[in-house]
Amino acid sequence: MAMSDPIADFLTRIRNAGMVYHDKVEVPASNVKKAIAEILKEEGFIKDVEYISDNKQGVIRCYLKYGQNRERVITGLKRISRPGLRVYAKKDEVPKVLGGLGVAILSTSKGLMTDKRARQEGLGGEVLCYIW
């Protein structure tokens, strides 16, 4: 069966792998998933990201990050805008996650970016997900 929401699948795979303390998770590649994985790496939620080409779609391998006593760095992921109900935010309505402790990922006219960067650049867009 065809996947109706690949971004939700990506977030769910990361959430499930984190719950059972896996070191890495592999997901089918797409440009949006690559951009989300890079943002997660820049924000310090995951250790590293690898792109593996298999002459088809390719695979993204994300290495998960844990604290000193194996506590999870990613405590929560939530898909906001979904295929059945799109959620958009104007430039002055960009949401803050947990008062700035979390990250909202937005799809803007200048590509995917965090809520902080969207506020700095004065951009709004589709609110893809929250990570904290």
Swiss-Prot record:
InterPro entries: Ribosomal_uS8, Ribosomal_uS8_CS, Ribosomal_uS8_sf. Pfam families: Ribosomal_S8. It comes from the Bacteria. Coiled coil: none annotated. One of its GO terms (molecular function) is structural constituent of ribosome. GO terms for cellular component: ribonucleoprotein complex; ribosome. Keywords: Ribonucleoprotein, Ribosomal protein, RNA-binding, rRNA-binding. GO terms for biological process: translation. Part of the 30S ribosomal subunit. Contacts proteins S5 and S12. One of the primary rRNA binding proteins, it binds directly to 16S rRNA central domain where it helps coordinate assembly of the platform of the 30S subunit. Belongs to the universal ribosomal protein uS8 family. This is Small ribosomal subunit protein uS8. The lineage of its organism: Bacteria, Bacillati, Bacillota, Clostridia, Eubacteriales. The gene is rpsH.
